[in-house]
Regions:
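N-terminal beta1-alpha1 cap of cysteine-dependent amidohydrolase-like domains
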Residues: 1-40, 47, 167
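A polyampholytic, Gly/Pro-enriched intrinsically disordered region
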Residues: 13-16, 73, 112
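Cysteine-nucleophile active-site neighborhood
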Residues: 29-98
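Short, well-ordered beta-to-alpha junction loops that form the rim of enzyme active sites
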Residues: 67, 158-159
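Short helix-loop capping/hinge motifs at secondary-structure junctions, enriched
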Residues: 100-104
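Catalytic beta-strand/loop cores that center a nucleophilic Ser/Cys/Thr
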Residues: 105-153, 158
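Conserved small/polar residues in nucleotide/adenosyl-binding loops
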Residues: 161-165
């Protein structure tokens, strides 16, 4: 990691081979600065998809965030990503499409989410997959959250950015 001290990495992280035989309640798979590349061009595509597949049998609930959400939707369900004409950047109003879903307990029907991304997945592609349920979207920012496998897989678009993310 270029921003995290090596001692922190050694203390709080492990490699996949040491985890293989274990079961976990939850896993978060997050983004990477590779969203403008085709998935198969990513150097570690084979390794990350192996982890995606492993999580289905060893993890109760998996949260795919940002690039990992697009990658997981593509790998598991064939949902493509699309390049945006210009980078989406800002805070956008979103609505809940399944307001009684437990993940929205305590949420208002409308809520705001920051986005910073060059690519998107589209509502119509998610709706073509019977196993996927669209949970939230924005008129301006598009798809925000989808769920599959009875709430065991959540896919959430990029919801954060740093002060230099507009670059």
């Amino acid at each position: 990691s270029k921003n995290t001290p090596i001692e922190h990495m050694k203390t709080f992280y492990t490699d996949f081979d040491k985890m293989r035989g274990e079961k976990y309640d939850g896993m978060i798979i997050t983004g990477a600065p590779v969203e403008q590349m085709d998935f198969e061009e990513v150097t570690y595509w084979d390794e990350i998809t192996e982890i995606f597949d492993w999580a289905r049998t060893h993890v109760t609930s998996t949260l795919y965030i940002c690039w990992a959400a697009q990658a997981g939707l593509y790998h598991h369900y064939g949902v493509p990503k699309y390049a945006l004409d210009k980078k989406m950047f800002g805070i956008f109003e979103h609505r809940t499409l399944q307001p009684l879903h437990p993940i929205f307990r305590g949420f208002d029907d409308m809520f705001y989410v920051p986005h910073s991304r060059h690519t998107e997945v589209r509502r119509e592609d998610i709706q073509k997959v019977p196993e996927l349920t669209l949970l939230s979207e924005s008129e301006d920012a598009g798809v925000y959250m989808a769920v599959a496998r009875g709430g065991r897989e959540f896919f959430v678009t990029c919801l954060l950015y740093t002060s230099d993310a507009a670059d």
